[in-house]
Amino acid sequence: MVKIQISAGAHQGVRPKDIVGAIANECGVEGRRIGAINIEARSAFVEVPRESADRVLSGLNGRKICGVPVRLRVAR
């Protein structure tokens, strides 16, 4: 699994189901394949399968989650 950081969190109203929905709908990754999700105040972290990481990064960068444009990167 690869942990990805998303530039929106609880302050923007992001919930785990929003992240799962965005990844499943925009990137074609099945929800059951998505790992742990951690929502912080201004960012969120999600684990995705290593083979899907590039697809998630390119598929969601600049897209909106809960009406907020997001940036994604591999978390350190």
Residues of each region from the PLM?
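Terminal-proximal interaction/regulatory segments of ATP-powered molecular machines
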Residues: 1-76
